Amino acid sequence: FDNYTVGTLQGQYVVDSLDLDNAGDKTYNIEFTAGDPADNNAGYFFNGAFDVLKPYIDAGTLNVVSGQTDFDSVATPAWDTQTALERMQNILASYYADGTQLDVALCSNDSTALGVTQAIESDYAGDNTVLITGQDGDEANLANIVDGKQSMTVYKAVANEAVVTLDLAKAMLAGDTIDESLIEKSGWDFECAYDTESYETSDGNKCPSFLLVPTVVTKDNLQEALVDPGYYTMDDDGYLHPAN
């Protein structure tokens, strides 16, 4: 999957939800929670979101009250929920205890979003609904989306990833040229792009990649995005569970 795009989808969701392009003199407060610094994917997620939001930060439309905007400051070792919870509790106590309004908690994934949500529920002095992003479509987070506690998650259909991997392996065994032509030959019914620039090996060599496009999931499209394709089932009460 295109992990940079995961971040841009999160960032663009914030832009669209707050209508930042038409904010005028209105300003919003945002805090970032990124992933494990030992996981190279975490940097792609964070950079994708930050690149979208940086123009609004530079313009003063978005304010990072804590001042924590670099990856190392906002990273969460092991993507740990408790670590994310405690860090957000510290931020809330240090910068928002006086009633300053927090509008957005940009979380790179669902495990960190879960901790951030818990911290906001227990320690946030404001009474507004905080926009919270995530990624993965974890069951607990989907329940929070149903309950209005989390705004969105970015879902990556691993079944589609498996299809691409299988077709790629077949093409390699057949001695076919591996390039963008594989996409047309395979006739996949999902969006995929061939990329030769974005990703590198550990020694700095470019790594050609087939990048699938993830899906933004909100309360409004849970059925269409997750249930109808068979990834999840939905109970009568609206809560989702992974399909067997």
PLM features: residue spans?
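A residue-level marker of the well-folded mature domains of exported/periplasmic proteins
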Residues: 1-244
